[in-house]
């Protein structure tokens, strides 16, 4: 979300009681690089980024890294998956009453897809390769 400051005050107040990783439709408003860096009840602020010191990079130019930790699920892939499914829903190309969303990946993309699908009320299938960590499978089973 490019301009979270445009979200109504009533919705922002409601979000104060919703955790960043909760399965709650209001967390669709948190698909943003500008989430306040707190796990419970946050609102918005500056872009979540950090300047990597020149002592580490070895170059004179500023190198800035974006921080995905403060997205729902702790991974920025919720943005990528929302960007895939939202246009299909809006244009009618995807009908959640008769179609499942399928999210194949090695981890965060399918996690983001399953999460966003759930918030939108869409049934989904997350596909992980066999050798992935037990934690990823357990998270998806929830």
Model-assigned labels for residue ranges:
Residues 1-142:
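PLP-dependent amino-acid enzyme catalytic core
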